[in-house]
């Protein structure tokens, strides 16, 4: 697909300058401005709705995009959700479930792409773990079947540019579910020193983050993600992502080395 066949709808055009330089048409619209969304979607056949990052506002924002797409005559929409969205205790899941349900009721032809965790989520911890030799989390014995952002992006592009995906719910995961002991080992391979996993309580996570300067509400949210991992919310392994991209998914070690 040529860049000129792609439209990127963004809130800040400056942040899409690299896309514009490649020949992608950049249009500006805010999630809250349904009129602008409708105008931005004129002439668009397929939409990729990447879930927003404003927790607590996400469903309303997603709903506006779905409504605008319907009004603009969009033929198909793919939405990036989360693993086990309809049964997950992950605090991120409820708004994804609401969006999935709203999309299903909209009448739009669609595909749900339930993305597992990103390996890149661990990159920011690398300096501290290299110094301490400890990976502390309230994830218990839970496992995470993460993949790289490029893996998810390549799989998504395949769905958008090939036929046969309408009405499907794809669980996009890495090829392997890693325990936090496995994740600690991956850190060790990259740092060249032993890294051990130290299970802690959710209260410990909150206390450590508050001490580091994070507000208590956000710290509690992060701790709740940890405890949901302990409950198995991200342990699902499905082969569909690897099948679509035609290769093994990227390893955590490779992503950490690229940090």
Residue ranges and their predicted role:
Residues 50, 80, 246:
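Residues lining the SAM
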């Amino acid at each position: 697909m040529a860049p000129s066949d792609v439209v990127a709808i963004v809130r800040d055009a400056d942040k899409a300058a690299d896309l514009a330089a490649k020949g992608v048409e950049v249009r500006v619209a805010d999630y809250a401005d349904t009129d602008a969304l409708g105008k931005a979607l004129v002439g668009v056949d397929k939409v990729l709705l990447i879930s927003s990052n404003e927790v607590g506002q996400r469903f309303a924002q997603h709903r506006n995009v779905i409504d605008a797409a319907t009004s603009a005559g969009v033929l198909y929409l793919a939405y990036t959700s989360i693993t086990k969205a309809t049964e997950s205790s992950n605090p991120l899941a409820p708004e994804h479930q609401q969006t999935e349900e709203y999309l299903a009721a909209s009448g739009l032809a669609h595909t749900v792409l339930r993305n597992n965790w990103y390996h890149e989520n661990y990159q920011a911890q690398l300096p501290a773990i290299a110094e301490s030799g400890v990976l502390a989390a309230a994830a218990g014995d839970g496992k995470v079947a993460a993949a790289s952002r490029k893996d998810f992006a390549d799989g998504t592009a395949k769905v958008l540019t090939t036929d046969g995906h309408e009405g499907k719910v794809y669980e996009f995961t890495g090829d392997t579910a890693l325990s936090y002991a496995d994740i600690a080992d991956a850190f060790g391979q990259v740092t060249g020193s032993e890294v051990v996993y130290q299970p802690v309580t959710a209260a410990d996570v909150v206390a450590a983050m508050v001490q580091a300067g994070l507000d208590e509400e956000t710290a509690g949210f992060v701790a709740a993600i940890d405890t949901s991992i302990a409950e198995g919310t991200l342990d699902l392994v499905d082969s569909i992502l690897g099948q679509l991209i035609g290769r093994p998914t990227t390893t955590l070690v490779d992503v950490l080395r690229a940090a």
